[in-house]
């Protein structure tokens, strides 16, 4: 069954968020994330942590279709590869880009033939092809970003992130910062790794409404019906600009795109709204990475970013291959283990009220200790 690891979990009316992780150790959603690379390879780093055996390790990464410089999960994954090479001088890394989904299998086979020590595939859509290759080549180590398997595969380090949690914090913050009483979110494609962010964001707004007796509305997503706004890809910035302009015209003053590079179109729309005389002030949140690093030209509009700890998770998968600690299995990044987090407020640090910051800390603690249960129809484990 296609994507069976997810489909099985998705049969439940509401899958309760999993707060535990297994497999190898990964942490820190606040790790710096790069904006991609100009070349398809990176030489071994000059870091201080040399591999004990001195054995050379080749780490190979395959992007999803958004490109290496998507300012999102591809760029973060490549930054993790480069961080591994910097940490261990015996590691070298390179990548292949997937222009379409038809490139997945040829790219995987190319790297298998090149005898890569670990092949890192990026994105939910690569789940089936990675599984097929891993089962056909049990001695080949893999890691995959944004997917997990049930049962876990011993030669695949499956890296998934419970972004319903920090999405919830983002929604709570957005509701608390909105002046119009309307906020909005949209996705690139309707995939579980996209809608889980949107579920969390939606629920965070509802929780704020409950606590403050407010009625802040969410445009672009309805968790109950699982219907909402999607641009259809992760690359078309014009679509992102258009859908954001529509939300702004409907009164939304905080926008949360879950759409990779499409989010740059949203940022352009926010920038244009800011320049329009007499218009309502509009701001936004970035996704996956700290937008003030990966899309710094729009930092003044980013209240925060709803992050995944992809950089550290990928780095650990590659360095674990080099030092012999690779375990395989499923890893779930959470608030508790540092795998997901809100980014710093940057330019908004003085604009977010102290009381709201305190509430966010309380909500974070509630999610971590289980007193706040987040339900999402997007599964977070295999």
Which residue ranges define each predicted feature?
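Short, low-complexity intrinsically disordered segments enriched in small and basic residues
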Residues: 1, 29-30
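A residue-level marker of the well-folded mature domains of exported/periplasmic proteins
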Residues: 31-382
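Bacterial signal peptide processing site
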Residues: 23-26
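Hydrophobic helical h-region of N-terminal Sec-dependent signal peptides
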Residues: 11-16
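Bacterial N-terminal signal peptides that target proteins for export
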Residues: 1-10
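C-terminal motif of bacterial Sec signal peptides marking the signal peptidase cleavage site
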Residues: 17-21
